[in-house]
C-alpha cells in the first residue's frame, strides 16, 4: 500500500474514527465517574436483593411454561409479517397487480401456517384431558354419575 493510498483512506474515514474515539472515551468516562462517585458500603445487607422494601421470599427463578415462549415467537413472526405488509402497502402503486398477487400469496402461506398451528394444538393452553372433557360433555357427566 503506497503512502498516497493510506492517506486517502484516512482522509475518507476520519469522521468515523473521531466518532469511535469519542464514543469509547465517553463510555470510559462514565464508568470511571461511577466508580469514583459510587458508594462503598460493605454490609451483609448489600448482598440481599431489594424488593420494594419487602424481604424477599422464595426463589427469584420462576419456571415458565414453554407456551409463553411459543406465543412470543408467534408474536415476532406475525409482527414481521405486518412489517412486510406495511412496506408493501406504501409501494402498492409501483408494484401493481404483480405485487398484489405476491402479497396475497405471502398472506396465504402465513394463514396456512396459522391453521396448521391451530390444528396441531400449538395454541391450546389447556391440557389434552380438559380439552377432551370440554369437547364431550355428555361423556364427562356419565363418568361423574358412575363415581
Curated annotation (Swiss-Prot):
It is a multi-pass membrane protein. InterPro entries: NAD(P)H_OxRDtase_bac/plastid (IPR023043), NADH_UbQ/plastoQ_OxRdtase_su3 (IPR000440), NDAH_ubi_oxred_su3_sf (IPR038430). It is an enzyme of class 7 (translocase). It comes from the Bacteria. GO terms for biological process: respiratory electron transport chain. The keyword Translocase applies. PANTHER family: NADH-QUINONE OXIDOREDUCTASE SUBUNIT A, NADH-UBIQUINONE OXIDOREDUCTASE CHAIN 3. This is NADH-quinone oxidoreductase subunit A. It comes from Escherichia coli (strain K12).
Amino acid at each position: 500500500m503506497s503512502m498516497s493510498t493510506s492517506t486517502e483512506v484516512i482522509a475518507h474515514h476520519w469522521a468515523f474514527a473521531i466518532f469511535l474515539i469519542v464514543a469509547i472515551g465517553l463510555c470510559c468516562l462514565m464508568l470511571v465517574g461511577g466508580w469514583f462517585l459510587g458508594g462503598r458500603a460493605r454490609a451483609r445487607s448489600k448482598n440481599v436483593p431489594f424488593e420494594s422494601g419487602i424481604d424477599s421470599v422464595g426463589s427469584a427463578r420462576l419456571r415458565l411454561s414453554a407456551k409463553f415462549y411459543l406465543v412470543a415467537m408467534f408474536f415476532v413472526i406475525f409482527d414481521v409479517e405486518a412489517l412486510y405488509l406495511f412496506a408493501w402497502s406504501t409501494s402498492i402503486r409501483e408494484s401493481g397487480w404483480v405485487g398484489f398477487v405476491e402479497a396475497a400469496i405471502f398472506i396465504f402461506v402465513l394463514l396456512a401456517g396459522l391453521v396448521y398451528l391451530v390444528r396441531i394444538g400449538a395454541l391450546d393452553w389447556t391440557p389434552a384431558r380438559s380439552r377432551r372433557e370440554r369437547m364431550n360433555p355428555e361423556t364427562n357427566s356419565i363418568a361423574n354419575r358412575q363415581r
